[in-house]
Amino acid sequence: LNPGLPESRAYVANIVADITSRYDIDGIHFDDYFYPYPVKNETFDDKETYLRHNTSKLSLDDWRRDNVNKVIKQINDTIKTIKPWVAFGVSPFGVWRNKSDDERGSNTRAGITNYDILYADVAKWIDSGWIDYVVPQIYWASGNKAADFDELYKWWANYSNAKSQVFVGHAIFKVNSGSKEWNNPEEMPSQIDKVRAND
């Protein structure tokens, strides 16, 4: 689905409305969503949609972020109109922005970020109250040079600052995967202990 198309956003909102109305649920959770991760020698071709629906004359990047913001707000509004107690949360990529690109960002050097590459302004969603919780996918080890787990779990906890709940997404699938940092039997228990101590 192309987030730039109003009918795509309405389609998703209608599905969420149906689920929320018909079932006794505690929440709706989105995981890996919206614009695709970059693939070498491939582009997401939404030029025609951009030209047709960019009525605010935004740059392509800002327009894409605005589309995703509209999806998130529309889903939240849909849920809260039907059942205000049902939680809405998202599990985004683990880095919102690098500090080198935005002083509010984390002290990381990630090649992919939510804001710049995936067009997901998770900080805005938190600030606007559009999500009840966030589960950042912090899939790096402590001490990783590009994206240190310790830096990131603290950044998300501090940024959210009670505006939304934070539950860390751990990379359990990487344990014993062959890399030195993930073959360390203490890495995952240590990450869990750090997050619990920061609660």
Please provide the spans of the model-predicted regions:
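Active-site-adjacent "subsite" loops/lids of carbohydrate-active enzymes
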Residues: 1-18, 22, 116-120
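Conserved, mostly hydrophobic/aromatic
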Residues: 12, 19, 28-31, 79, ...
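Generic structural signal for well-ordered alpha-helices
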Residues: 16-20, 69-77, 122-123, 150-157, ...
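Aromatic- and acid-rich polysaccharide-binding/catalytic face
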Residues: 26, 31, 46-58, 107-108, ...
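Substrate-binding cleft of secreted/luminal carbohydrate-active enzymes
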Residues: 119-145, 156-199
